[in-house]
Amino acid sequence: MRPEFSAELSELDSTLTTIEKVLNPQEMSDRVRELEAQAADPSLWDDPDHAQQVTSELSHVQAELRKITDLRQRIEDLPIMVELAEEEDGDTSIAEEELADLRSLIDALEVKTMLSGEYDAREAVINIRSGAGGVDAADWAEMLMRMYTRWAEKNGHKVDIYDISYAEEAGIKSATFVVHGDYMYGQLSVEQGAHRLVRISPFDNQGRRQTSFAEVEVLPVVEKVDSIDIPDADVRVDVYRSSGPGGQSVNTTDSAVRLTHIPTGIVVTCQNEKSQIQNKASAMRVLQAKLLERKRQEERAEMDALGAGGNASWGNQMRSYVLHPYQMVKDLRTNFEVNDPQKVLDGDIDGLLEAGIRWRMAESQSAE
């Protein structure tokens, strides 16, 4: 085996060993047996919500345990694969592809070990609002929504759009959607902040360069254990007809719902479900998420906590997307750069997410 091949394999083996110490496969295996016993109890479904939590956790832990076991087996098999290839014809290209695949999978698993926050395993609510920049900012907000939904689709995660407020000329004023799947909040929460776009404006007949901003807010989906109870008297409910681009009505009934939380002034709208009841339920989920985040901010006394909301303008951006006069996406916190903005805008943001998660971990450790 070539020395450089052996060295990289040894490094991956060491990284996986560190991951195993953090995730503890034996404890995971014990937890699987415990959950399987609960799932086999016929009385479990007397409480459907608890039953759903048990089956969901069981499925998740089983999948993670299989992933670790499979990676360990593949690392142990790789030297044999290389040895056989060298003995037959010396072509180790298949083994090299396997090594590259293992490197990618282990890097991704290593990042997941950094998602240990209280809410990191949750699904994510994403709010996008256009900021400074007029019609270009509205168009930019819609481009960001497309970027995140494309990323979710590529990774097999369902997206439910709760609300879109369209701008008059082009783009959107705001959008709210949920990305389903384990650890979506932990991964996507690093996207929170002001995103800056520099390009030749397609809306300027003189073809001038335009800078525009959009704000991204990421919240964890609220679960029953969070105890976010909202008295009916604290919420004003308004209903209206759903509208589409240009303000056109897309529904003949008042199915869209606007919730106003009277004590805080927080407003949430939802118009994409088929009925008023469904829209109200979806809007309530988002309102609960916002109130949970407000509660966390108060407890931690941090004005820049998750979901605090910022000013999408100069001096507040966390990432720049430059399409002119050169091509580059640069995260201003991590200094991670991508020289193909279109690829990023098409949903290829894994590198940016990983860099953000590693940066957040380093910041957390340095603050201790």
Swiss-Prot record:
N5-methylglutamine modification sites are Q248
Top-level taxonomic group: Bacteria
Q: Does the keyword Cytoplasm apply?
A: yes
Name the InterPro entries for this protein. PCRF, Pep_chain_release_fac_I, Pep_chain_release_fac_I_sf, PrfB
Q: Pfam families this protein is in?
A: PCRF, RF-1
Q: Where, subcellularly, is it found? A: Cytoplasm
Q: How is it modified after translation?
A: Methylated by PrmC. Methylation increases the termination efficiency of RF2.
Q: Provide a GO CC annotation, any one.
A: cytoplasm
Record GO terms (molecular function): translation release factor activity, codon specific
Q: Which SUPFAM superfamilies match?
A: Release factor (SSF75620)
Question: What does the UniProt function comment say about this protein?
Answer: Peptide chain release factor 2 directs the termination of translation in response to the peptide chain termination codons UGA and UAA.
Family (UniProt): Belongs to the prokaryotic/mitochondrial release factor family.
Q: Which PANTHER family match?
A: CLASS I PEPTIDE CHAIN RELEASE FACTOR, PEPTIDE CHAIN RELEASE FACTOR 2
Query: What protein is this chain from?
Result: Peptide chain release factor 2
Organism the protein comes from: Corynebacterium glutamicum (strain ATCC 13032 / DSM 20300 / JCM 1318 / BCRC 11384 / CCUG 27702 / LMG 3730 / NBRC 12168 / NCIMB 10025 / NRRL B-2784 / 534)
